[in-house]
Amino acid sequence: MEQHELFDVTVIGGGPAGLYSTFYSGLREMKTKVIEYQPELGGKIHVYPEKMIWDVGGLTPITGAKLMEQLVEQALTFSPTVVLNEKVESITRNEEGIFVLNGSSGELHYSKSVIVAIGSGILNPQKLEIEGAERFEVTNLHYTVKSFKQFKDKTIIISGGGNSAVDWANELEPIAKKVYLTYRKEELGGHGQEAQATKLLESSVECFFQSSITKLIANGERDEIATVELTNHETGEVSCLVVDDVVISHGYEQDATLLENSELSIERVDNYYIAGNATSESSIEGLYAAGDILTYEGKINLIAGAFQDAANAVNKAKQFIQPDAAKVAMVSSHNEMFKKRNKELVKQLVGK
């Protein structure tokens, strides 16, 4: 019989929920693997590396990039196996009750338990549906804002009206020469962003509602966008704006193929989210979920909430593979696993 390396738990997804699941499973002395589709860990935080995050308990305002750096460092504490550039395409279960994860590389991953932490899915931004638009992606057509500095003193148009579009417009307004925003609806969208929307509408950002980008006109000398054509869907009026950069914020496609292709009958909500409970259990014994992919009554869709989901998922996974295990891990301040590490940290502090 062919032997395969078997893990106690495999975490699918390397965002905040997946990273904390990875750390906490190491804390519970579980042999852990984390699989991430992107070439690096961090998840959706890569979309807003310079955005300030205020709502993580115990942390003063921190940039997305810094939080991501710290989450990754924490996740690697107990030396888990990390697999990057791998998409888990389906989950099955063999005759021995072991989960078999089918990777896009052709590799099969074997695990006693699984934690699904794929958030809103693989990050595939919805592209601008204009013929030839893709050729500008190497110059001045952007689907995320990774550095505000690159837009300093430039004229920018942002297409979109959701949370990210509004946030980017507000962040860029003080440093850019001019910011335009075009949105296909009558008013800004987003959830819980009323204050940010009001701030934008009262700023120098010039908004074009019920309008969309219908044409990108290139610079004759260089292969980059020089002018954007906007069309008002109500009046049919066409206007042209001279710009330096175009930012598209039309959301992300939800890739539900992992759950759709799996032979396991995982109960879902809205044909995507995993239906679970407050202790991160799914309808499949041994398979748990954490973060935005998990839904239950009273769910908190915050990074802080993802951490609680992760700890619950790991605790349940631990008891699933070892029924006599403690329900929860020993708190870090009294945990013997950190004794040696704490001594080293104290030495470093005293040395300073």
Residue map of PLM features:
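A Rossmann-like FAD-binding core segment of flavoenzymes
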Residues: 75-103, 108-111, 173-272, 325-332
